[in-house]
Amino acid sequence: MGWVWKDDDEQGGHVNPSAADISPRLDGDRCSTRKVVRTQCKTEEVEPGKFIRKCEKTEEVLRDCVGRPIEVVQSNKEYTEDDVTDQVMKGSVSFGSADNGAFNFPGLQHDIDEIEHNFLGGLSRFFEAAEDMKNGFFSSFGIPHIFDEGPSTSLPSPRREIPIDSPRQLEAFQKAYGTKSGEVDLSGLARDV
């Protein structure tokens, strides 16, 4: 599936021809898309001593829009059959026995890795959005970004420093409190980490 994303500043009437089944939303609603992959497998003994693992893999692209039900944009199903007779006879395929682990199912580790990857990625995006909201909120009141200011720019700096660490802030502190000796009481600025 191919997507061509265009900025809202460009002509809004263009729709990707490969996505003709998707109705264009030009009303400014907040929508997101996500891909859901489900795999269901079962092992069957098709004849005495012969085992086949049958899997059904479903991939769906879903669109979530505020105030609307979830919409299935695309859905694909894939069926596979694998001969697992050797694995079953050797005992390497687990059917939930305690000695091999209750969660030792084929493909489970991959699913767990995908869940972890998606969860941590979503969590980091959440924290980035929360930090952006915090910065926007405090900047609307004119509160300076003590920990985000670099030496010569107003953009956030990846280097975090204590408020008196930069020379510019040290000079401002000395002017405000009339001290030139460098002796500063930092007890009020200490924070738990």
Swiss-Prot record:
Which gene specifies this protein's sequence?
Answer: AP
For region Disordered, the annotated ranges are 1-27
Read off the PANTHER family from this record.
Answer: MAL D 1-ASSOCIATED PROTEIN
Q: Extract the InterPro entries matched here.
A: Fra_a_1-associated (IPR053346)
Q: What is this protein called?
A: Fra a 1-associated protein
Q: How does it assemble?
A: Interacts with FRAA1E, FRAA2 and FRAA3.
